[in-house]
């Protein structure tokens, strides 16, 4: 059982390739509770504070402060599968209307 849900913005611990250190970055949980059942992984979309350009699949978060983010941010079209133990904590939740917009961007990116 996970302590996070679809639409949650979480802090993820990414280990450097040389395994000499790690950095924490935010991500948006996009997988469902059903997906999480019996798995040790979750699917998330990366979040960046580099808002200088929007690429296909990117969505600029309007309620970034309310979501617990420190800076204006973009949910990117970069989707990753990570182990549950990489999630360092929950920062907040993306409002339903914005999650719907992200879903539309993912559909566009993945031709779903």
Predicted regions, residues:
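C-terminal terminal-subdomain/extension
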Residues: 2, 64-112
């Amino acid at each position: 059982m996970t302590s996070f849900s679809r639409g949650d913005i979480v802090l993820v611990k990414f280990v450097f390739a040389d395994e000499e250190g790690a950095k924490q970055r935010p991500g948006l949980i996009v997988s469902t509770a059903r997906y999480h059942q019996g798995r040790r992984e979750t699917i998330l979309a990366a979040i960046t504070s580099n808002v200088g350009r929007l690429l296909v699949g990117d969505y600029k978060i309007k309620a970034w402060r309310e979501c617990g983010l420190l800076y204006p941010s973009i949910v990117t079209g970069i989707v990753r599968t990570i182990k549950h133990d990489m999630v360092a904590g929950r920062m907040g939740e993306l409002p339903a209307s914005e999650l719907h917009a992200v879903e539309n961007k993912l559909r566009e990116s993945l031709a779903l």
